[in-house]
């Protein structure tokens, strides 16, 4: 048995669903889920961590410093609030005793490797070197299966060691320096006050302090500005003096006098025009920043709204048949991720990855019936690809007209590069399954797969298949005829054979050539061959259902399978689902058909093609009913879409009827990468787009025109859409950032109905739509005018700016701020009517404080922290009381004093260079050029020297910090007088456990202590009880009060007398 360890519970579920040959069995232990499944004859258990299960803690904690002797302990011991991890550790510990092999399937990065390493070593109690590694970059079924068949022999010890080193260094720095500061205050004041700093926290606080010092040390300087106020065309205007600031008041006075005496004239006019290019498409970060600027949305709120827009409606009935790379499947039966067929920009069939969406519906749906009998059930807002008014466009169901024509798939080019070897390697690599080679040799598919993946075998002919060397089945195209025939006849798998009701001439002779025995029994005719039965299981053979894995990828196989199914059924008496599947398969062979009177009728024009393609394999005279399928052909040859329609893998059918009905139940949709459409019941429909992206590039194959045509139906976007549709070419402006998994954020073209979107969703949708339209538009042209007015030797300037060509600003200008200042017409030599020469006194201003966003940006620029840690570091600074203010960050006196102390005694710890130096060493560990032991030892040496110097000055440091810290502390709560020495009995807290107790203020000279309840407010009563012990009231949150004596032996204490 094998234990697969994932990083998080949801990832464990996805891995289990992907690897299971049948649905995995979900179990729970200690309230934690795990999964059992079979893969290639092997039993697997897929379980998970929940992030880091282990953290660092000192082996022998004396609460002193320096301390370097650390060990990995359960994270709930190392950190408060992580108790939930205990059950995950217990689960892995129990499961590890039931298995012999281990596979790490955590995220493939340093943290993922540390999580896997520590889970193996401490929870499972095994050497991490014995585990194999699943390496994947996406959680699609295809990627996970590929990772399963390409296991790394071990975990990546370079990444694991680098991650372990980083954890240890961060612990060394954070814990030792925090303890040093805390001990310094204790030595100086006798108070335990916890202060903290660290490798990244220190440098971050340092640059905030630097800004605060700039502000505090800033001395405002007076200066004067001079303005020339004049009148032109009945309006007042202001021109500014050529010097921004005049530092001498007397000079300012002199200038004013000289200007007043001299006539003012226009001496120069400078006009410039600049192109302002359109903005690039939205990545998530840019969308978040602009939404904050325009609407005040937080980044989290923007992401939530974008996710909501992404998942809004656009859904299909659960029985909708989807054309996948494995065959035609009901959408409700699809795995969460996989591969479907889609139409590319040129309307050619292509394959693309999908992700399944599911939601509950209680709403109106639409039944769209085409003239060829095809039916499709959609929610009101799910778009269908239609030909309308000479153009192709995606139109939601509730906007469809009966005059519209719908696009269906029709494969016009065979794709036969998929062979038996490809099929066998996809469905199994079991040690018990064998391929029979052309020379008669047998080779296990497991070994064969490894040889192919290593490139040692590139071209090999496979002629047969064997399971456990119990017989063999020959692999020829005719095999698919037999499988199709058995499916049509309802052949049931029983034991090592397939049973049909009676012998038929169609398969006599064929079974013999395929090495399958025919045996007559009381039940009927048995096709006996263990290897054949094994193959049927692997390709998901089901009686009476025209569907097996693999046939869709090879047209010869598809022809043979359909011929066999036809010979067995004559296409009569079939279920509607079977008819639909056969209709889609015929479309993939380039044959159009019609469903009428519960029968499948081939298009009269395609009858000859039907007979030619299936006649190659059929053993009967092919007779099939025909009908004139009303294919639309009246295309506008001037249309932009005409060449693509003519050469595409499609045909177009009119709509017969559109009916509404109410539906309550599950509905589904797909998110399809790159092509953003898929084939449902043979019809091209749209999908959703994905908001979590770092890309500033639109999909290469995206049909921009489709989307813009749909957006033109919204009145407020119509003028801009029509402008773009009139352009000879739609070419977007794009940015440099690219996300290999997801394109930039853009509107899909589905049109929201009134009431579909909330107010906030509507705001964000408007911004996304306008940004999308803007990237296709022409640059804006801005004109600036600078007029020089001279009065004697003195010059004044007045400037204006205006947009002379709107370009993209026409659609996106509401989210861009440009000052529009239009000046009157001036002429060189024109005399200016001066109303006033004004002198104003001003003062210089200090630099602005950082905002939270500016802090994150500064950390990025300095290389401090990571995307995952920067926000938390800033939050820690708030929690420690080092900074305050949510919009404008101010460093508190405590924060200032901590940095002042670190600068004076341990300047290295707040050095950006030190942080960068050790980050470089982490990279060298990963590359195998340094060992983690070398880096950790160097860190110990560096830190030891720092702390040795710190200890020499510990008292001075403590005295400096105590002035701030102790002054801010609340006075201790006095509950009475000590019966032994007369000192104050005060509430204290254990430095290790944090638990409270009552003790004498004269400790350590007096050791009187009392225990006390850990919950509730303590209220002194000024009363005493046994042996002079004080009596106090404990008030709970619900208002109840308890009067108790603090003496443990007091009867009153033992009964806890309730006070009302």
From Swiss-Prot:
Superkingdom of this protein's organism: Archaea
Gene Ontology terms describing biological process: DNA repair; DNA topological change; intein-mediated protein splicing; intron homing
Ranges for domain Toprim: 1-141
Binding residue positions for Mg(2+): 7, 107
Post-translational modification: This protein undergoes a protein self splicing that involves a post-translational excision of the intervening region (intein) followed by peptide ligation.
Annotated TM spans: none
Pfam families hit by this protein: Intein_splicing, Topoisom_bac, Toprim, Zn_ribbon_Top1
Residue stretches making up the DOD-type homing endonuclease domain: 482-591
Interaction with DNA: annotated segments: 196-201
GO cellular component, one term: chromosome
Catalytic activity, as annotated: ATP-independent breakage of single-stranded DNA, followed by passage and rejoining
Active site: 690 (o-(5'-phospho-dna)-tyrosine intermediate)
Family as reported in the entry's similarity comment: Belongs to the type IA topoisomerase family.
Function according to Swiss-Prot or TrEMBL: Releases the supercoiling and torsional tension of DNA, which is introduced during the DNA replication and transcription, by transiently cleaving and rejoining one strand of the DNA duplex. Introduces a single-strand break via transesterification at a target site in duplex DNA. The scissile phosphodiester is attacked by the catalytic tyrosine of the enzyme, resulting in the formation of a DNA-(5'-phosphotyrosyl)-enzyme intermediate and the expulsion of a 3'-OH DNA strand. The free DNA strand then undergoes passage around the unbroken strand, thus removing DNA supercoils.
Remaining remarks: When a topoisomerase transiently breaks a DNA backbone bond, it simultaneously forms a protein-DNA link, in which a tyrosyl oxygen in the enzyme is joined to a DNA phosphorus at one end of the enzyme-severed DNA strand.
Descriptive protein name: DNA topoisomerase 1
